[in-house]
Amino acid sequence: GALRNLTSRQFQGYGQLEWLFKESSRERWSAFAGISGNRNDSFLKGKSFSSTGPGGWNQTGYARIGANYGANQGRFSWNASVYGLQGMPSFSSDLQLEELGATGIKPGESRALGGSLNLNWFVNSTVQLSLGGSGQVAFNELTGDMGFTLGSDTGLKGLPGTYISGDSGYLWTTELTWTFWTNRKMALQLSPFLGAGRVSSQRSQGNFSDTVGSGAILLRWLANRNWNLELGWISPFEVEERPYWEDWLLGSGVYTKLQYRF
């Protein structure tokens, strides 16, 4: 269909300042403030198209402020974060603001509060249990870059970060990691994963909500504290609005991830 000829390109920049209030061997307190800018270019059959700006591009931005807390005690460690989002209309042109307003989105009134909590339990020297939860509540309609997403590295494994998102939402994850082989430079881990979440949005055209979850079994290879290679099997569940997700190889099938840390 026509959607096969539709492509997009995204550019995003984010700058942040962090203030460290307290740091010791057991806990850490900090606050942060940052600004994000996002630009989306749309193409149909290789040609730019959009009614919201010249050249087929849309641009938005927002400010983010919040605080972080982390601690560890014995075999447990945890960290928590709270933040607030405020849309910045100065990133968009007058025409783009007019088009956004037609869908009920006013960047100057786009606001949200969110937070996350993660807990790690080191059962013994080879087994670790990780639990995580996060959520966001929007007080008005948000621009796309301010939304809460269920995918990407911080969410459900195997789910693209932009696949399911909404103004408000929540997410929970649990992962058990067993390091069954290690030497001075490398380690092999086996890790079952389970997670699920829900997002919702309100627009002038109507309301939207979606729920999705995924389970996985992963084999992870770590080397020299730089390389991280994951290979496993992913299976989705609790798919509501987009049941065809379960038929995709990307949604139910082989999952790979390669990461290098500098």
Regions flagged by a language model, labelled:
Residues 7, 57, 209-211, 248:
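A generic structural micro-feature
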Residues 22-24, 124, 224:
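Residue-level recognition of beta-strand termini and adjacent short loop/turns
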Residues 202-208:
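Short, glycine/charged-rich beta-strand-loop motifs at protein surfaces that mediate ligand recognition
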